[in-house]
């Protein structure tokens, strides 16, 4: 079974399952991203109890789905393409029914060092056949060809959380700008979270009013470094 939501790669993965002659049941629910929903739990329980599945699959990890799969003793395979992904700090990642694949090998190592054995490394997949077929069609090669290209979001269009912070002191603003500037000159090591002192973190929390998830163990310093500073730095 595959949880159905408007994710990147949805069509490609469904084509992959079809080529393998796998029988796929799509499950969708408005509360799929929530951390608590009796409605989601009941709906998914009903599907899993009345049909037989080898495993459940989703792009990105969803704690509610992990909870139901654990309860029903069904393998839950998730491939996470969003980074950072705060849902990975839910206690539900510890369930033995999970198979969580990340494209960030250093993050896999980090989780495994903490004793979380349900994390595995896998590069981002691509549907080469579909891309090949697209290249057979006419396109503006001069405009769309390059030695190096970047496809993705710089987070300046949406989700620029850093610029939304209101009420932080000029000292804190200068401090944060300085550590981001320093980080921009360092490749291969992220030290931003280490630079967030308890006092700075408390001031950011007073400005952002971030509500921690009841099933999560993520620290405020992680939230502010990865979701606010790293996105701005990108």
Residues covered by each model-derived region:
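Nucleotide-sugar donor-binding catalytic core of glycosyltransferases
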Residues: 1-9, 117-118, 123-234
